[in-house]
């Protein structure tokens, strides 16, 4: 228990010695004129708010003796011989800025504990958001090799390609699709069922750069951001027979919208069929060249499934693009056989179904050789 000499060192000579549990008189008395309630709370007295300088007087002794002895005490006051309750005492502690050896150890311990609390809080927030342990994503080349090796049937498309859209990570952003090809679009192409022998088409970005022309309208600047069944029939205005055969609702359900990588280019002859005769002349605005993307004012599906050439000009052999049928696309086979299309296209579709046992050779190449022999 501290004696009178201990109290006299930090205090003024006019002060009265205090009992344990009460703060020094000079510090509490100095603050009691401006904030009597705060000094009364620091002294632990009930009448300290109105008593002024007597906030830590005899009433403080009475209330301090009634408190539980296990209340937390101020560590800085304890280093200098005082036992002060810690509650409400931080602003009025006389040694809060003390730089002695014991008080500096207290300050260092408080800084370390505060840093640990902040670190634990930050780690908890990162684990909730999933930032601290990111899942490593495979590169585009690994996805290509993996998905091409898993393709067992070259003529069948993936079953989810008729209605499901590709994942958002593989779709190009509007800024990225402005006139150049982004390499992360290639896994979306392989997920739609490429063959095993078209690795030269997949790995060449220059081949795909001819398809991603910047659109004139902002609605179509994303590649797959068109309605699923927006089929404005391109052949309706010029050939009525094809329009009538395509106009029914079962045809809309059986024909899926082809993505733009299946539009043919000069090197992609695996997806092309040279028609020896074209019986449906159409105007030039509906005709699809390999270097020109689909017009934005047309439906995005009809102009990509069938392309016609006008007149019997054989200098440029334009291609009739077809989609290899899956189990959901039986309407495409019946459409090509019932509509007045060329016999070569229907024969190519039927032969593609029977060529599933030969993964190395594609059925269209056989049809092309037969047409050249004739």
UniProtKB/Swiss-Prot annotation:
The keyword Zinc applies. It is found in: Nucleus. Disruption phenotype: Severe defects in the adult testis with hypoplastic testes and disorganization of seminiferous tubules and absence of germ cells, due to pre-meiotic germ cell death in testes. Sertoli cell fail to differentiate. Female mutant mice have normal ovaries and are fertile. Depending on the strain background mice also show testis teratomas: deletion in 129/Sv strain causes a high incidence of teratomas, whereas these tumors do not form in C57BL/6J mutant mice. GO terms for cellular component: cytoplasm; female germ cell nucleus; nucleoplasm; nucleus. GO terms for molecular function: chromatin binding; cis-regulatory region sequence-specific DNA binding; DNA-binding transcription activator activity, RNA polymerase II-specific; identical protein binding; metal ion binding; RNA polymerase II transcription regulatory region sequence-specific DNA binding; sequence-specific DNA binding. It holds the Pfam family DM. This is Doublesex- and mab-3-related transcription factor 1. Keywords: Activator, Developmental protein, Differentiation, DNA-binding, Metal-binding, Nucleus, Phosphoprotein, Repressor, Sexual differentiation, Transcription, Transcription regulation, Tumor suppressor, Zinc. Belongs to the DMRT family. Residues 354-364 have a biased composition (Polar residues). Residues 1-73, 154-176, 317-374 are annotated as: Disordered. Residues 70-116 bind DNA. The modification Phosphoserine is found at residue 337. Residues 41-63 have a biased composition (Gly residues).
């Amino acid at each position: 228990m501290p004696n009178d000499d201990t109290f006299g060192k930090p205090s003024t000579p006019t002060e009265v010695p205090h009992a344990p549990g009460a703060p020094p008189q000079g510090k509490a008395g100095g603050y009691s004129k401006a904030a009597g309630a705060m000094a009364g709370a620091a002294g632990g007295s009930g009448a300290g708010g109105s008593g002024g300088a007597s906030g830590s007087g005899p009433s403080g002794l009475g209330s301090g003796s009634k408190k539980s002895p296990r209340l937390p005490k101020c560590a800085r006051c304890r280093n200098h011989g005082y036992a002060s309750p810690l509650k409400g005492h931080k602003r009025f502690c006389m040694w809060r800025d003390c730089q002695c050896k014991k008080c500096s150890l207290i300050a260092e311990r408080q800084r370390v504990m505060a840093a640990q609390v902040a670190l634990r809080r930050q780690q908890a927030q990162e684990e909730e958001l999933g930032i601290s342990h990111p899942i490593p994503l495979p590169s585009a080349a690994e996805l290509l090799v993996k998905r091409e090796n898993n393709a067992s049937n070259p003529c069948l498309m993936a079953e989810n390609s008729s209605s499901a859209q590709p994942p958002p990570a593989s779709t190009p952003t509007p800024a990225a699709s402005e006139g150049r090809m982004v390499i992360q679009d290639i896994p979306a192409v392989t997920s739609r069922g490429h063959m095993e022998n078209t690795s030269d088409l997949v790995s060449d970005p220059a081949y795909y750069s001819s398809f991603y022309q910047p659109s004139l309208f902002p609605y179509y600047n994303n590649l797959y951001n068109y309605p699923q069944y927006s089929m404005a029939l391109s052949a309706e205005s010029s050939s009525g027979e094809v329009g009538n055969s395509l106009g029914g609702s079962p045809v809309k359900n059986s024909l899926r919208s082809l993505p733009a990588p299946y539009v043919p280019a000069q090197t992609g002859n695996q997806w092309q069929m040279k028609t020896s005769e074209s019986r449906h002349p159409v105007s030039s605005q509906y005709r699809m060249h390999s270097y020109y993307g689909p017009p934005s004012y047309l439906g995005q599906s009809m102009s990509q499934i069938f392309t016609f050439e006008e007149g019997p000009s054989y200098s440029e052999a334009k291609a009739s693009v077809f989609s290899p049928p899956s189990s959901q696309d039986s309407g495409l086979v019946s459409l090509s056989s019932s509509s007045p299309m060329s016999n070569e296209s229907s024969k190519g579709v039927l032969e593609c179904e029977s060529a599933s046992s030969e993964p190395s050779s594609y059925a269209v190449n056989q049809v092309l050789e037969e047409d050249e022999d004739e």
